[in-house]
Amino acid sequence: MSILLKAAGLLFLGMLQAFPKDRPLDTTCTGDLSYYPGEAARNCCYQCPSGLSPTQPCPQGPATARSSVILTTTNEDRKCTACVTCLPGLVEKAPCSGNSPRICECQPGMYCSTPAVNSCARCSEKTVVKFPDTAEKNTICDLPSPGSGPNGSNPDDCKTLTSHTTPQAIPTLESPANDSVRSLLPKQVTDFVNEGATKLVKVPESSSSKASMPSPDPGNAEMNMTLKLPPPGTVPDISTSENSMEPASTASTLSLLVDARTSSRMQPTSPLSTGTPFLDPGSMLFWVAMVVLLVGSASFLLCYWKACRRRFQRKFHLNYLQQTFQPKMEQVDSCPTEKLTQLQRSGSVTDSSAGHTLSPLSPPAVETGASVGTACLETLPLLDDSITGNSFAPREPPEPRVSTEHTNNRIEKIYIMKADTVIVGSVKTEVPEGRAPVGSTESELEAELEVDHTPHYPEQETEPPLGSCTEVMFSVEEGGKEDHEPTTVSEK
């Protein structure tokens, strides 16, 4: 029992040590504006006043705020941020205040190539114009000379002309002698000349800054303008003597414009300069090849599909003809009805003069070969009930067909005579055991089967047509005759 108590005590002490000992009490910061809720919302943090910065993430009072160049900015998180100092090579643009940081920029003569927030990460030197741009050449820029202004800049800073920039002013042509030259200029150039003439300011003439006049040759105008430029620190003179109202640079400007105009007329213009679109022969050749390939493949597939369709149609047509016109075995009803009637008549007719019934042939006597007319012969039942003369007596089942192995039946020749009687060759029949013909004895059957073997009229010998149904005929003499010949069988 004591061991259990000790174990419970140790467990209780471990649980007490698991709780934090210096956990602050939960407070609310709604009453005091100088405090704001901390990140965990369990305590309040002191809000540093303007000009003070906190010394810890969550200051607890004024003692934790210190006075320095640190800026206390009230942002969205209500935290204080420090003021930044400008890096070497940067100058202060705007000082640090209670609600805005310090803004730094590059020194004079430099420009910011990599901007940063309220500062610049990399400054690069500015360039000035070394050679101005012409109709054939772009502006050539260079680093400023040591004699430049204090800020390291020059009025002719290197700038790339774009569609949004306004071109430099061109002096107006006030001399009547220059009307013919003005007519050669395009309308846009004359408009720019008229607009820029109002902005020109006359500068006193000086011999050192006076630019030399170009040579009369238009081809040397560009060289004169390029090589003879005033020093970088001076401004070229754009005016002449007081007696003349035309600027000194008018002639050179006009010569340049006329030269550019005439050269543009004489030289063939390219599609890129005129702005007209043109087709690349490489891409056109590719698209033409693709179109030809697509058309060829489509035509090949269509022809192949048509050939396959014709082949399938022929195959399906043959199959349809085979299924539609397939020969079928003729049934009992397909045989001529009159032949069946004649068969019934020949088997049941009685001789009125003799007064006795003719004995019918046994089933083996009418059997033929297996290959000719077996369908109709097998389906024709022998009417044995008609022998007794009772048409309403129950019909006995037909005799099973006797195979050729148990009989020696053989019809040698068939002769068709002009008389009503058909004579057939000798027929020998083996009667199955245990069965005798009804209404006759063996002697009478042998007497009836004795037939004349002498052939008659061999020229009338016929053969049964192929595909015809085998006909079994029993020819019976009419009732008025006295000669009672045996019933004969014919097979066509």
Curated annotation (Swiss-Prot):
GO terms for cellular component: plasma membrane. Residues 141-178, 336-366, 432-492 are annotated as: Disordered. Residues 144-155 have a biased composition (Low complexity). It comes from the Eukaryota. It is found in: Cell membrane. Residues 304-492 are cytoplasmic. Residues 160-178, 339-360 have a biased composition (Polar residues). GO terms for biological process: cellular response to mechanical stimulus; positive regulation of apoptotic process; positive regulation of TRAIL production; positive regulation of tumor necrosis factor production; signal transduction. SMART domains: TNFR (SM00208). Glycans are attached at N151, N178, N224. The chain crosses the membrane at residues 283-303. Residues 1-18 form the signal peptide. Its main location: membrane. Disulfide bonds join C58-C80, C83-C96, C86-C104, C123-C141. Belongs to the TNFR8 family. Interacts with TRAF1, TRAF2, TRAF3 and TRAF5. This is Tumor necrosis factor receptor superfamily member 8. It comes from Rattus norvegicus (Rat).
